[in-house]
Amino acid sequence: MSTHLRKLPGLLLCLLLALPAWYLGRLFPIIGAPVFAILLGMLLALFYGHRDKTKEGISFTSKCILQTAVVLLGFGLNLTQVMAVGMQSLPIIISTIATALLVAYGLQKWLRLDVNTATLVGVGSSICGGSAIAATAPVIKAKDDEVAKAISVIFLFNMLAALLFPSLGQLLGLSNEGFAIFAGTAVNDTSSVTATATAWDAIHHSNTLDGATIVKLTRTLAILPITLGLSLYRAKKEHDIVTEENFSLRKSFPRFILFFLLASLITTLMTSFGVSAEVFHSLKTLSKFFIVMAMAAIGLNTNLVKLIKTGGQAILLGAICWVAITLVSLAMQLSLGIW
């Protein structure tokens, strides 16, 4: 049997799990399809015994399909629009990202948490939830159970943010503009940002959704420097351990991240010539679906019992990152005169 045919059973299994997860994600956007995909994968893994037939396809989906999803994610980024609208929030975005990464790095040893999980929780909390985890996982060579743990943590605090932030914003007296920036900088995943801003708009009859989404997309750009930095750091560290040859910068660059940048540049260039952003809508949707497929594969490779037993430290780290980002976002708004 050829290599491609050997991958087919596992690929089809991930596809079959992704379809109901996608549907459930549309019904319950506060949770999101990737979380449903991981849950379905982990539940099936408890009873599924034909691993030899599907192993190659599951591995292909969790790696290659995931990287393809990140590349396609670039077609949702118009760099001109993001920078024009998101510049006001840039100091807040930089501050919240730096805060979460420093918290994750600083507390990793104290919590006795593995480096990869701490890194994924840090980037997921600070940049763009599941998409940032999807982009970072191949770069740091994270295991599937580490990815599942980080995604689960991000989901928990996404849900809490969507439920609590509209009331918190009202209690603090945030303006519509202030809440858009708050939701865009302090909520992790795009679907949760949408849910949070929509809840605010329903209460105040406003339109914060567009502003919050643009701020969120501006955060997404941080995928590039963060993943490239992590890639170079890891490659240099591994290089120093195994060899004394000169370090190659070109070989260390993750190609799929460069293709992500190229996709963003193509989108920006074509829209500047009058091409409608709707042209790229199907590619953006395909990117999201590929992420759901990859999360199903990761769920299939994750031991649910072990995840429950070892997830406490990751949840605590996620909670601290979440609170820190929330406080820094509000403090920066106060210092900049937005709030």
Swiss-Prot record:
<protein>
    <recommendedName>
        <fullName>UPF0324 membrane protein spyM18_1033</fullName>
    </recommendedName>
</protein>
<feature type="transmembrane region" description="Helical">
    <location>
        <begin position="57"/>
        <end position="79"/>
    </location>
</feature>
<feature type="transmembrane region" description="Helical">
    <location>
        <begin position="118"/>
        <end position="140"/>
    </location>
</feature>
<feature type="transmembrane region" description="Helical">
    <location>
        <begin position="150"/>
        <end position="172"/>
    </location>
</feature>
<feature type="transmembrane region" description="Helical">
    <location>
        <begin position="314"/>
        <end position="336"/>
    </location>
</feature>
<feature type="transmembrane region" description="Helical">
    <location>
        <begin position="7"/>
        <end position="24"/>
    </location>
</feature>
<feature type="transmembrane region" description="Helical">
    <location>
        <begin position="84"/>
        <end position="106"/>
    </location>
</feature>
<keyword id="KW-1133">Transmembrane helix</keyword>
<feature type="transmembrane region" description="Helical">
    <location>
        <begin position="290"/>
        <end position="307"/>
    </location>
</feature>
<dbReference type="Pfam" id="PF03601">
    <property type="entry name" value="Cons_hypoth698"/>
</dbReference>
<keyword id="KW-1003">Cell membrane</keyword>
<keyword id="KW-0812">Transmembrane</keyword>
<feature type="transmembrane region" description="Helical">
    <location>
        <begin position="256"/>
        <end position="275"/>
    </location>
</feature>
<comment type="similarity">
    <text>Belongs to the UPF0324 family.</text>
</comment>
<keyword id="KW-0472">Membrane</keyword>
<feature type="transmembrane region" description="Helical">
    <location>
        <begin position="28"/>
        <end position="50"/>
    </location>
</feature>
<dbReference type="GO" id="GO:0005886">
    <property type="term" value="C:plasma membrane"/>
</dbReference>
<dbReference type="InterPro" id="IPR018383">
    <property type="entry name" value="UPF0324_pro"/>
</dbReference>
